[in-house]
């Protein structure tokens, strides 16, 4: 008879958790940032608020966003006027949309990741699903299992209402699942749709308006497993360590509340300051075991909460401009997609590395960091190890 220790040993993987595939998806409806203020004030019947509209135009100009994708279009908003008011009961209408559309968009991203992975979906042992867009029972994890035709025995974890740091959280959880369950293949999906936060303008809460200028829809999926079978699986990044912390003196800096009016979003003015002041401590703790203290020697994936956060982090750490290039590119092409953003950036980085003929998946560098920032103020820090690019792939 096997001892507990022997059973335990047999359950564990040998090597680190590894990202084996990435897929992304957006709704088809694309809105350019230059046109958004006119569209937004017209659709919410707020054109009479001329000063506020000018203010919103300046917010959109400064956002460094070129375009965003949104499930909500003119037709849907015309049918749901309460969603266009600043504070009107509208949760039922919002829930009706997101309960269906969040798993659907997640399916699109997951299907791409599974296709890239190239293995039968019956080999997926775990599913981690994350969304800040609506809640339901059984959850979006259950709906996605059905939509994809995963095995009924797939082990599911549903994460609702985490917010913008959760792209780091899902990787931290997937790492623990993959490394503690030999042969596990974890499908991770983040799917976000702004139908839950969209609302008309008000001059009393400008932080709500900031959200309207930044948020976009998107879903991203990754497959994570340890001890990859390199004859059929292609490792992209290894997940070496992961940490979560609540920043000091940050109570109420970012929060959201699900109410009859939908998900309301609040943030204090100094969020970029709080993050940039504390980020070096997170980096130092994460990279001390590796003896790394030159932050420019790393490849960077940071949740692009907004341009001010990126600017202040860059300046505080003395980062070279190219360090946040992939991060800024995703912000400019998609806006802030909450938890899905960092996975989009991971995808962007490996693609750039392959197409640019780099020697590793991390822009030619060995070590990297992935940061999530969100409500709390909570910070997720994931240490990544890149993988050498096979010679045939880089040509």
UniProtKB/Swiss-Prot annotation:
Q: Reply yes or no: does the keyword Acyltransferase apply.
A: yes
Catalytic residues identified in the record:
164
Lineage, top-rank taxon, reads Eukaryota
The entry's protein name is Chalcone synthase
Question: What is the uppermost EC class here?
Answer: transferase
According to the UniProt entry, its GO molecular function terms are: naringenin-chalcone synthase activity
Under what conditions is it induced?
A: By ozone.
Extract the coiled-coil ranges from the record: none
Q: Which UniProt keywords apply?
A: Acyltransferase, Flavonoid biosynthesis, Transferase
Which pathway is recorded for this entry? Answer: Secondary metabolite biosynthesis; flavonoid biosynthesis
Family as reported in the entry's similarity comment: Belongs to the thiolase-like superfamily. Chalcone/stilbene synthases family.
Which EC numbers characterise this protein's activity in its record? 2.3.1.74
Record Gene3D superfamilies: 3.40.47.10
A single Pfam family it belongs to is Chal_sti_synt_N
Q: Provide the reaction this enzyme catalyses.
A: (E)-4-coumaroyl-CoA + 3 malonyl-CoA + 3 H(+) = 2',4,4',6'-tetrahydroxychalcone + 3 CO2 + 4 CoA
What is this protein's function per UniProt? The primary product of this enzyme is 4,2',4',6'-tetrahydroxychalcone (also termed naringenin-chalcone or chalcone) which can under specific conditions spontaneously isomerize into naringenin.
The biological processes this protein is annotated with in GO are:
flavonoid biosynthetic process; polyketide biosynthetic process
